[in-house]
């Protein structure tokens, strides 16, 4: 709701001051309201939630890698989590979250955005074959294995309206994850997809995302679809230290919510089959 037509931005055109769309100074805070609709097509259930995301500091991971820490109180209505990111001149790398999923732990670290942003630019974030899915979908007591690919695309710039206001030149990014789940009890594959469309405003960060997660029907069930939306209500952006400067290589954050998912690339499945994604 509230997003207009993509502006006339040519493919390959660089979006000026890309870093300014992803403020991540410690103390910056975003408040979102969210909605989830889930279930087979015939039985959709709606839930509402709130999430506050804030930049809390840095952490040194094993191996000496220093990452930024983003704390979310309830992203995607899944309880509190911390997410870890590192930025350099090439872009932003995601190092996972706490708590994270077994699947995510096998994928990180991976790049979530490239600098500078360019319209219609896509890149493959990960492509892993035959890894542990971390869940037993078919109920035979054995975790399934999965082939998983993630691709990110900068769609362009357009106007977006949310409770916090209207942002006329927001950057729209689409992240698509595709899973081919190999069922251990039968010689067949279940297909899952997670598509997140997110809008970022200059000087503000994430203002909205829409995420659709789908799992094809298994056996006699009707499959499962989950739609998650978060919209910005309030934001407080702290200024960067004067000595830090601002450039294409300055700190950027792809999603202030977490995935979500990475958070950005997690799939929610039917009740009882759902990895903890946030």
Positions of predicted regions on the chain:
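Conserved functional acidic sites
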Residues: 9-278
């Amino acid at each position: 709701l509230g997003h207009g037509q993509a502006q006339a931005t040519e493919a390959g055109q660089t979006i000026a001051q890309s870093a300014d769309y992803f403020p991540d100074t410690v103390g910056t805070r975003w408040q979102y309201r969210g909605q989830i609709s889930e279930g087979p097509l015939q039985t959709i259930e709606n839930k509402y939630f709130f999430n506050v995301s804030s930049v809390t500091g840095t952490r040194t991971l094993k191996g000496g890698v220093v990452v930024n820490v983003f704390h979310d109180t309830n992203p995607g209505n899944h309880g509190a989590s911390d997410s870890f990111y590192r930025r350099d001149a090439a872009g932003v790398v995601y190092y996972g979250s706490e708590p994270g999923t077994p699947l995510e732990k096998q994928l990180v670290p991976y790049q979530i955005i490239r600098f500078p942003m360019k319209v219609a630019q896509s890149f493959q974030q990960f492509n892993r074959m035959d890894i542990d899915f971390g869940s037993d979908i078919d109920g035979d007591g054995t975790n399934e294995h999965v082939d998983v690919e993630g691709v990110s695309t900068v769609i362009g710039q357009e106007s977006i309206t949310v409770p916090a206001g209207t942002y006329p030149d927001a950057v729209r990014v689409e992240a698509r994850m595709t899973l081919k789940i190999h069922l251990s009890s039968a010689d067949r594959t279940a297909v899952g997809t997670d598509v997140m469309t997110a809008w970022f405003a200059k000087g503000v960060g994430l203002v909205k995302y829409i995420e659709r997660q789908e799992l094809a029907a298994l056996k006699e069930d009707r499959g499962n679809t989950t739609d998650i939306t978060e919209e910005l209500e309030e934001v407080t952006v702290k200024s960067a230290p004067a000595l830090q400067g601002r450039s294409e290589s300055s700190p950027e954050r792809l999603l202030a919510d977490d995935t979500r998912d990475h958070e950005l690339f997690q799939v929610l499945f039917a009740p009882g089959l759902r990895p903890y994604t946030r």
